[in-house]
């Protein structure tokens, strides 16, 4: 039975309007903070650390959390497709944010930075995480399975991305302990967190369904 146009409640306002607006404002605020720090202090000292943390949070949210969540709660196609889209969006945003496609005074393009493998790695890694999550979880609501899938897929995606970084002539992330922590360990932590969030989403969904049909 479909919902009529007069059937509204507080949850619709809360989760349909307020929460999405808060999320986009937080993202916009983080972007503004990064731009402000870049103009004032650059990438040195405490400003560089803060910019790095913000950049990592944004990257993990877009290229890991979204495709992994859709893969866990929906299916492999939703996870893979969202991973492709989110990875593409992040790659484009990264290129625009750091002016990688600007043109120098002599007419020489900044594409000389040779970050093609890096940008492609973000797209493929996000797509891989989302697709594998859906294929391995298979709509399961068992938390242990979701946690194992979340940790396993993000570890695979992290190692794949780290390997793609090594193919870039302008690679700034070496294949060492630092690179592991930055690309793999952070993704594994995000995978565990997203598994918890996915379980909460499923739990609320099941209870909402039971309440509505009672």
Stretch-by-stretch model annotation:
Residues 63-64, 82-87, 122-126:
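Mid-membrane cores of alpha-helical transmembrane segments in multi-pass membrane proteins
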Residues 78-91, 145-155:
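Central hydrophobic cores of alpha-helical transmembrane segments
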Residues 3-7, 28-57, 98-102, 106-214:
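Membrane-embedded alpha-helical hairpins and interfacial helices in multi-pass inner-membrane proteins
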Residues 55-83, 132:
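Generic transmembrane alpha-helix motif of multi-pass integral membrane proteins
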Residues 12-19, 69, 142-147:
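Alpha-helical transmembrane segments and their helix-start/interface "positive-inside/aromatic belt" motifs
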Residues 14-31:
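Alpha-helical transmembrane segments
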Residues 1-13, 17:
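N-terminal signal-anchor transmembrane helix
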């Amino acid at each position: 039975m479909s919902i009529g146009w007069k059937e509204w409640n507080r949850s619709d306002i809360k989760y349909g309007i307020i929460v999405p607006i808060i999320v986009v404002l937080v993202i916009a605020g983080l972007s503004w903070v990064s731009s402000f720090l870049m103009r004032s202090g650059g990438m040195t000292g405490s400003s560089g650390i803060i910019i790095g943390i913000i950049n990592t949070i944004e990257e993990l949210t877009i290229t890991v959390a979204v495709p992994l969540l859709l893969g866990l709660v929906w299916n492999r196609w939703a996870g893979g497709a969202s991973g492709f889209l989110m990875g593409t969006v992040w790659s484009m945003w990264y290129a625009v944010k750091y002016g990688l496609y600007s043109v120098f005074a002599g007419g020489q393009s900044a594409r000389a930075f040779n970050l093609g493998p890096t940008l492609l790695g973000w797209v493929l890694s996000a797509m891989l995480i989302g697709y594998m999550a859906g294929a391995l979880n298979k709509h399961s609501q068992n938390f242990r399975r979701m946690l194992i899938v979340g940790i396993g897929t993000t570890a695979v995606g992290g190692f794949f991305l780290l390997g793609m970084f090594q193919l870039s002539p302008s690679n700034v992330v070496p294949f060492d302990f630092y690179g592991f922590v930055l690309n793999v360990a952070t993704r594994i932590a995000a995978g565990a967190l997203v598994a918890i969030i996915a379980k909460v989403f499923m739990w609320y969904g099941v209870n909402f369904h039971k309440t509505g049909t009672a």
